[in-house]
């Protein structure tokens, strides 16, 4: 059975693994998921990620990040734009997550960017998710 929303599935897996204090989480890989993982690593929400090439398909393995007392780096994730309801934002009306403490992941014509990067470049796009 095919997945309707693979991005929501990825974010749910990462959130559930973080809430259960798992060290790693694996999922089927795609270019979009790898770019989202790059943004999460760049912003400090995950420790690392690897793409493993198998015979059947590629697997994305994300290593979760915790503080010294096992505090989660990833407090919450929310999927904004879905296949049934796309949400777009202009460059002048980009969302801020928790007053700038979180990150909005935006799909633009220049690739996947955070809300800060998109506002610096002056581009808008589809708001994929909020991470805090």
Swiss-Prot record:
Keywords: Ribonucleoprotein, Ribosomal protein, RNA-binding, rRNA-binding. GO terms for biological process: translation. The keyword Manganese does not apply. One of its GO terms (cellular component) is ribonucleoprotein complex. Pfam families: Ribosomal_S8. One of its GO terms (molecular function) is rRNA binding. The keyword DNA-binding does not apply. InterPro entries: Ribosomal_uS8 (IPR000630), Ribosomal_uS8_sf (IPR035987). PANTHER family: 40S RIBOSOMAL PROTEIN S15A. One of the primary rRNA binding proteins, it binds directly to 16S rRNA central domain where it helps coordinate assembly of the platform of the 30S subunit. HAMAP family: Ribosomal_uS8_B (MF_01302_B). Belongs to the universal ribosomal protein uS8 family. Part of the 30S ribosomal subunit. Contacts proteins S5 and S12. NCBIfam families: PRK00136.1 (NF001109). This is Small ribosomal subunit protein uS8. It comes from Corynebacterium kroppenstedtii (strain DSM 44385 / JCM 11950 / CIP 105744 / CCUG 35717). The gene is rpsH.
